[in-house]
Amino acid sequence: MTAVYAGFWVERRTEHGVVQALPADAQGFCPKRPSVSGPRNATDCVMFAGNCKRKEDKLVQSFYDTMIAGQRYMLILQGLGFTILIAVCAILIGTVLGCFFALMKVSDRKILKGIANFYTTVLRAIPLATQLMIFYFVIFAPLGMNRLLVAILAYGFNSGAYCTEIFRAGIQGIDKGQTEAGLSLGLNKNQTLFKIILPQAVKAVLPTYTSEFIVLIKETSVASFIAVMDLTKAGDMIRNATYNAWIPLLTCAVIYLILTIGLTKVFGLLEKRMAKSDR
């Protein structure tokens, strides 16, 4: 029986033919398996744990130096307060304006439809940051109005344009047979609208309305264009003071995420309760 090396393999000649095999003395020719990183014994485990502990301590110290020292976290809380205040006040203004202009859009009078169409077209076409600066530097500049109030009005009017289309779609999405049924019961057109159509429209538009509120919260991040210290501006101020960007900005991102998820859950529960009331 003879063996001839051919690369890594050896030809072993037998009476049945040629069989390829990898002999023991050829193991050195095989490529080695990559070593597995990580601790392999007790000493390595101790060193690995020590490295993790040092990194954790460094992260905690970095967070303390950036956010806790100098009470910079108060800037985040203050910015969060302004963000929530702007968003809540703006969505209330937007809801009122949206209802008003939506009713104008579904009316039979062309002049009312024209006014509502002009409002929604202009406010939805111009970027929000541009509207914000127009409100502050042009419209309300002679009055010297407070920046925060100007921001609330600008966001409210912008939200109103989107709420108008949301409510209009909800009203027109209700089957016309509902209106005919109300009229057949002796209700006039306005009574039918407010007692039959609008309650059904509210349930239909709730998911879209929730999305508008969430978008509005995120859009408050451009309030700093007129020097309003919203949540994002607070994070940027901490970044400028500490030269550490990722901790304050990541903190702001997590807060926005919590607000968004929280609102989604709250409105989801409200939607479920309204759905149960129909049964």
Task: List where the protein language model places each region.
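Basic polycationic patches enriched in arginine
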Residues: 12-13, 33, 40, 54
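Short, Lys/Arg-enriched N-terminal segments with co-localized hydrophobic residues
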Residues: 39-59
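Short linear motifs in low-complexity or flexible loops
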Residues: 2-3, 14, 21-26
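Intrinsically disordered, low-complexity segments
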Residues: 33-35, 60
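Short hydrophobic alpha-helical segments enriched in small aliphatic residues
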Residues: 6, 17, 26, 42, ...
